[in-house]
Amino acid sequence: MNLSELRPAPGARKKPTRKGQGIGSGLGKTAGKGHKGQNARSGGGVRPGFEGGQMPLQRRFPKRGFTNIFKKQITAINLDELNVFEAGTEVTPELLLEAGLIKKVGDGVKILGDGILEKALTVKVHAFSKSAVEKITAAGGKAEVI
């Protein structure tokens, strides 16, 4: 068997229907568009979201909220992800970036207390959760806010 001898499985390929090519085709004469009317015309049809004149869904619901331009983009990371570092390492946002644990520093880095820290680390970031501080000190490390 060669690549040039390969054939599609029976029934895998279906010929496209040629609309308007005789009434025997089943899609002749009006080509599935019905008689006259907006949808039978060239370029006919209603725009997306048009509901026949009734108030569209998009306009029935009220506007809500706003975008706070002063919102802080704080990058969060869980405690168990810090186990990749050697004991005694000083963990900073720059080190987390280099290690690929975070994608960007943004407006700061926050350590969350999910998981268990198995090594004594000095962690210097912008914010900590209460449980994260407790677990870092329990492991023999230090949590410093920069």
Swiss-Prot record:
Signal peptide: none annotated. The keyword Ribosomal protein applies. It comes from the Bacteria. Keywords: Ribonucleoprotein, Ribosomal protein, RNA-binding, rRNA-binding. GO terms for molecular function: rRNA binding; structural constituent of ribosome. It holds the Pfam family Ribosomal_L27A. GO terms for biological process: translation. SUPFAM superfamilies: Ribosomal proteins L15p and L18e. Residues 1-58 are annotated as: Disordered. GO terms for cellular component: cytosolic large ribosomal subunit. Residues 21-31, 42-52 have a biased composition (Gly residues). NCBIfam families: rplO_bact (TIGR01071). Part of the 50S ribosomal subunit. Belongs to the universal ribosomal protein uL15 family. Binds to the 23S rRNA. This is Large ribosomal subunit protein uL15. It comes from Desulforamulus reducens (strain ATCC BAA-1160 / DSM 100696 / MI-1) (Desulfotomaculum reducens). The gene is rplO.
